[in-house]
């Protein structure tokens, strides 16, 4: 198992609101605890922090291109726009709608 395969899987499924360490472990035929430990040892960050960073970076890029907040939320794996907006604001320190204005 190569971390690069896992990272590729994450990128390909970033839009999936069910993307989780459990799902990836199952798809890669690994135990949850082994994947969690190995991922952090290799990348230096936890699986959830890695996924959050990717989602927030992609969201910011999509918003900067003029995409609607509700569309972006869905494209980066969040069913609920309000939850996405709170996470985005906590992560970046600005509201998603403020990215559209800059």
What are these regions (language model features)?
Residues 8, 41-79, 101-102:
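Terminal helix-turn-helix DNA-binding modules in bacterial transcription factors
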């Amino acid at each position: 198992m190569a971390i690069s395969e896992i990272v590729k899987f994450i990128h390909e499924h970033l839009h999936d609101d069910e993307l989780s360490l459990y799902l990836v472990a199952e798809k890669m035929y690994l135990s949850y605890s082994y994947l969690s430990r190995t991922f952090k040892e290799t990348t230096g960050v936890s699986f959830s922090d890695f996924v959050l960073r990717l989602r927030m970076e992609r969201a910011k890029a999509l918003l900067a291109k003029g995409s609607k907040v509700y569309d972006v939320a869905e494209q980066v794996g969040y069913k609920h726009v309000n939850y996405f907006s709170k996470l985005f604001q906590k992560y970046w320190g600005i509201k998603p709608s403020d990215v559209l204005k800059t």
